[in-house]
Swiss-Prot record:
Top-level taxonomy: Bacteria, Pseudomonadati, Pseudomonadota, Alphaproteobacteria, Hyphomicrobiales
Entry annotation: catalytic residues: 71
EC number(s) per entry: 4.2.1.59, 5.3.3.14
GO terms for cellular component: cytoplasm
Origin species: Nitrobacter winogradskyi (strain ATCC 25391 / DSM 10237 / CIP 104748 / NCIMB 11846 / Nb-255)
Role of this protein: Necessary for the introduction of cis unsaturation into fatty acids. Catalyzes the dehydration of (3R)-3-hydroxydecanoyl-ACP to E-(2)-decenoyl-ACP and then its isomerization to Z-(3)-decenoyl-ACP. Can catalyze the dehydratase reaction for beta-hydroxyacyl-ACPs with saturated chain lengths up to 16:0, being most active on intermediate chain length.
The reaction(s) this protein catalyses: a (3R)-hydroxyacyl-[ACP] = a (2E)-enoyl-[ACP] + H2O; (3R)-hydroxydecanoyl-[ACP] = (2E)-decenoyl-[ACP] + H2O; (2E)-decenoyl-[ACP] = (3Z)-decenoyl-[ACP]
Superkingdom to which the source organism belongs: Bacteria
Pathway(s) this gene product operates in, as recorded in its UniProt entry: Lipid metabolism; fatty acid biosynthesis
UniProt-recorded name of the protein: 3-hydroxydecanoyl-[acyl-carrier-protein] dehydratase
Gene3D superfamilies referenced in this protein's UniProt entry, alphabetically: Hotdog Thioesterase
Gene coding for it: fabA
Keywords linked to the UniProt accession: Cytoplasm, Fatty acid biosynthesis, Fatty acid metabolism, Isomerase, Lipid biosynthesis, Lipid metabolism, Lyase
CDD domains: FabA
Primary location class: cytoplasm
Family of the protein in this entry: Belongs to the thioester dehydratase family. FabA subfamily.
Length: 174
């Protein structure tokens, strides 16, 4: 039975990473350290900018996060690709939450703009994804717009994030 709460704590996210929320192999989140948020604070099917769904998540930023120690020595900054990956992770989670089956894969995006950085003094990152479209055929495909804020300043904007759920052996390159 699929888990349809409107929010998830860290343990719930780990359960998703272990394949315990949506069934084995279905829309699993990565496990730490690649899990890029600590909780989902809101998920629904009729909210967001387009009225087709919303998912919002948060990351508590601590100076000892794994990426600050290696990116870059003496100039710590969260890699922009990790914030982008968090947005893709959230689209995949939404697809599983709405009943989609298959393994999640990021498929691209239309546009990405960075106007700031996540640095060690930042206390909280908020991710927001507004679902634009979900298609269900041989694969489940989600298209969404998203943003990332650092201490309430929106610093990343992504348009047309694309994530697909693929049945085993049917993913890109298979």
């Amino acid at each position: 039975m699929q888990d349809r709460r409107s929010s998830y704590d860290y343990e719930g996210l780990l359960a998703c990473g272990r394949g315990e929320l949506f069934g084995p192999g279905n829309a699993q989140l990565p496990l730490p350290p690649m899990l890029m948020f600590d909780r989902i604070t809101d998920i629904n099917e009729d909210g967001g900018e387009f009225g087709k769904g919303l998912i919002r998540a948060e990351l508590d930023v601590k100076p000892d996060l794994w990426f600050f120690g290696c990116h870059f020595k003496g100039d710590p900054v969260m890699p922009g690709c990790l914030g982008l990956d968090a947005l893709w992770q959230m689209v995949g989670f939404f697809l599983g939450w709405t009943g989609g089956e298959g393994r999640g894969r990021a498929l691209g995006l239309g546009e990405l703009k960075f106007t700031g950085q996540v640095l060690p003094p930042v206390r909280k990152v908020v991710y927001n994804v507004d679902i634009k479209r979900v298609m269900r055929s041989k694969l489940v495909l989600g298209i969404a717009d998203g943003w990332l804020s650092a201490d309430d300043d929106i610093i990343y904007r992504a348009k047309d994030l694309k994530v697909g759920l693929f049945k085993q052996d049917a993913g890109p390159g298979a």
